[in-house]
Amino acid sequence: MAGLQQGCHFEGQNWTAPHWKTCLPCQGPWRLTVSHLKTVSSISVLSVVFWSVLLWADSLSLLAWARETFTLGVLGPWDCDPIFAQALPSIATQLAVDQVNQDASLLPGSQLDFKVLPTGCDTPHALATFVAHKNIVAAFVGPVNPGFCSAAALLAQGWGKSLFSWACEAPEGGGDLVPTLPSAADVLLSVMRHFGWARWAIVSSHQDIWVTTAQQLATAFRTHGLPIGLVTSLGPGEKGATEVCKQLHSVHGLKIVVLCMHSALLGGLEQTTLLHCAWEEGLTDGRLVFLPYDTLLFALPYGNRSYLVLDDHGPLQEAYDAVLTVSLESSPESHAFTATEMSGGATANLEPEQVSPLFGTIYDAVILLAHALNRSETHGAGLSGAHLGDHVRALDVAGFSQRIRTDGKGRRLAQYVILDTDGEGSQLVPTHILDTSTWQVQPLGKPIHFPGGSPPAHDASCWFDPNTLCIRGVQPLGSLLTLTIACVLALVGGFLAYFIRLGLQQLRLLRGPHRILLTSQELTFLQRTPSRRRPHVDSGSESRSVVDGGSPRSVTQGSARSLPAFLEHTNVALYQGEWVWLKKFEAGVAPDLRPSSLSFLRKLREMRHENVTAFLGLFVGPGVSAMVLEHCARGSLEDLLQNENLRLDWTFKASLLLDLIRGLRYLHHRRFPHGRLKSRNCVVDTRFVLKITDHGYAEFLESHCSSRPQPAPEELLWTAPELLRGPGKATFKGDVFSLAIILQEVLTRDPPYCSWGLSAEEIIRKVASPPPLCRPLVSPDQGPLECIQLMQLCWEEAPDDRPSLDQIYTQFKSINQGKKTSVVDSMLRMLEKYSESLEDLVQERTEELELERRKTERLLSQMLPPSVAHALKMGTTVEPEYFDQVTIYFSDIVGFTTISALSEPIEVVGFLNDLYTLFDAVLDSHDVYKVETIGDAYMVASGLPRRNGNRHAAEIANLALDILSYAGNFRMRHAPDVPIRVRAGLHSGPCVAGVVGLTMPRYCLFGDTVNTASRMESTGLPYRIHVSQSTVQALLSLDEGYKIDVRGQTELKGKGLEETYWLTGKVGFCRPLPTPLSIKPGDPWQDRINQEIRTGFAKARQGLAEPRKSGEAGPGP
């Protein structure tokens, strides 16, 4: 039989790879003639030849069996990408493996084998395939996907295997990751440095392998300091290409577009679509150069090779004129194999098929791996795949398209060629060559044909100089002198303009009707606080008397004093016959009247509104600086609300609130947020008109860089949560939140957040750090529902959800149906209401208080023992109490977990409420105390808090029998066919009882008796009352006829083996008890009960069970 034959044909640069065929020689039938029978002697000769052939074949098989095999794996997306599959990895690897195995100088005594490992096109699946074959192969060729190069390198290092990949970057100096080609990023940088193009864009296909390639390429470019204008990927179809073209249009100064996708020359549809779109959008007119990335990974055929996609004289042929193709150089004489060499000199019947040029890249990687393995074995490392990168230095062997050469550091050296078209033909023409040993680009004599006749403009050379700082393509050192001169001239001109403007502004500040600076000659300071009536005095004469230092002249409400001494104790003065208020700055702070501060003061001066206090000027006196504001004699809104002698009805409140909203609306229309709005800086004048004050104070301090005093926690109760968390700058939405807090104050006449009962620090912390949201509580009877809803809308957590002041103003006016409120009429109505009988009101409040007191005491006595409740009411300490003899009852529901899982939460709550209401009714007929219920657990004690001698065991035993009897007939409403199996545990002994906690205090029991009773319940069985020996002794001492059966030794957690008993009845107890299950040791009774519960629920869900009321008797268990 003929052996397997191989072959490969090369036709110039248009090379093809073979199909494999098994060629069997034609064997005709044996034809025996008389001549054969007569030649007897020939039989012996044939026999000798036959046995000799057999012995020779056997020796060859033994020799092959004795050779050690090194298996390598070829990773790649061979199964999911048709263009990658055209590389024929099986044939390429087989050719290389056969060449190695046939070379006697390579791997003597060993042989090379391979496995092709399809990885899929996505990174997770590729990494999983890589990990799955760690024990099958000794080294890897790949990966092709750079997305998992780093992970694969780390894993391979741990496994002691090497990776030979043309897609992965690796540090110099060998190791387990060996690049089989020079860095693609370095090749592109060398080409672009030669042409002087620095501004890049990278467009990739949507496939994972190409997206990752684009990202790593962009990272490499940014590492070299190059500007990357765009990194994007193509969406599906022509729409995605159109979107990318629009993005390329928008990038300023772009020169190069790297295309990370399959080349259009090899059938890449994405690149074909993108180039067609670029041609339609006019991007192929010479302004851009498109550069395919995938051709850097193989030797693309050129010369006499024609490409059909460029032979149609269509848009793609014209668009490809703007494409420069960089590919490995390919020389016909450099091919490692010819058809004769690969077939071993034998004739082969092969059918040619066009394949991807990546075929040769795979072949070279296997050859490089084989030579590294040969050197490793020569140096005594054995046939191991570890650290093969240390053995590829200074290598020079025959490759597929050119010789495989490496330098002294193991870096691959190769030659690249730049290919171009003229926009009319279908062939690629070499124009430049790049040798990676020198990284120099040399022209080959034929110039590049650029669309439009000229290449894109050069970028600044500083982009490619690692020792030069390049800012937007300009070398700063070249224009430093010009910039310095321009800056000096600009500074001189600016200083001159500044001083001239400052002088003019100083004149305006002190003269004219719009002056801002006020002096001591214009203010009169009084000894006493002014009355609500406006005094009429001659401000000019009064000012002169103060300045002259003589005896003060008599005025209406007081006398003037010497200015320096009196200013420390007053904030009120007279200015042009009107009372004014001085908002003083901190001691030692002298406002710096710089232009920004003066502009701010003029803005304040121009604000005039009846609901905003007027800013009259800035007073600077000896040791005192203050803002002069309009004075309102009735004080702040906070003072007004705290005045209990003043009754405020809704009309009065609405009038104040409407004034507040109008004033704040005016500030917001002037683009002036308040930032510190609170009821303390809302003042009321003599006509009960509310005005907003204190606006601009903090901003003025900030405008001339003066320190802003740190507010106390009580001052921050009106501040919005986003301002508490952030820098605290004034915002319009922050004022809306403050308005909502003032609304709460006015409606309730209480301080902010008073209903929480917390300190200011705690409230601020809760407001600033939700959830939960912390907001004031306002009952519906404290104001109109519409006003409360508006208030709640204003304090929304998200600032964008709060309404604007225009919306608030419109909504608030609608609350009063647009009517104007009169404060005088409101005060008259309040006086009429105040004349009503207070005695009836006091009597009504007294009766309500007594009723609430009785309710509270009754509720407290249900939650705690009466003695404990009384002590808590009196405020005395509840001391823990020791009880020497008590009996504790624990019970739970068997299968409760399964019941809960099969029921809705509301059904579980209803079922437990029905069951425990039934149990609570049983408690009334026994001397017991219910301690607590937690989930399905029910805890009762007797002998505490009221001692009952030796009756505690009997009371609990009687209770347990009653509960067991009632539980046997109990049925759930939503699953009436499911029986409720209760198990109980009893134990007697001493314990300690006391109250734990101040918030929601609980009466708790402590001691080993509690734990033992719980263990008795947890080790019991359904429809059983598990009793400890101490309880049995107490019951037998009473001699009341309790029926007790011995259970035997029971393992109790923390106790070991103890003798326990079943309480099965009592003489004279006539109620029926449910029949316990027949349970043997080791019997999985829990599974049986859970299955029964599931069956019952299934019936209930299907409507097979008859509906019953909860607690109604049903069929016995």
Curated annotation (Swiss-Prot):
Name by which UniProt lists this protein: Guanylate cyclase D
Enzyme Commission identifier(s): 4.6.1.2
Tissue expression per record: Found in a subset of olfactory neurons in the main olfactory epithelium.
State which ranges are Cytoplasmic (membrane side): 501-1117
Q: Which segment of the chain is annotated as a signal peptide?
A: 1-66
Function text: Functions as an olfactory receptor activated by urine odorants, uroguanylin and guanylin and as well by the volatile semiochemicals carbon disulfide (CS2) and carbon dioxide (CO2). Has guanylate cyclase activity upon binding of the ligand. Activation of GUCY2D neurons leads to the cGMP-dependent activation of the CNGA3 channels, membrane depolarization and an increase in action potential frequency. Signaling pathways activated by GUCY2D may trigger social behaviors such as acquisition of food preference.
Q: Which species is listed as the source?
A: Mus musculus
GO annotation, biological process: cGMP biosynthetic process; detection of carbon dioxide; detection of chemical stimulus involved in sensory perception of smell; intracellular signal transduction; olfactory behavior; olfactory learning; positive regulation of cGMP-mediated signaling; receptor guanylyl cyclase signaling pathway
Chain positions covered by the region annotation Disordered: 529-557, 1096-1117
* Stretches assigned to the Protein kinase domain: 541-812
UniProt membrane topology term: Single-pass type I membrane protein
Record note on domains = The protein kinase domain is predicted to be catalytically inactive.
Q: Which residues form the Guanylate cyclase domain?
A: 887-1017
Q: How is its activity regulated?
A: Activated by Ca(2+).
Q: What are the leading ranks of the lineage?
A: Eukaryota, Metazoa, Chordata, Craniata, Vertebrata
Q: Name one GO molecular function term.
A: protein kinase activity
Residue ranges annotated as Extracellular topological domain:
67-479
Name its cellular compartments.
Cell projection, Cilium membrane
According to its UniProt record, this protein's enzyme class is: lyase
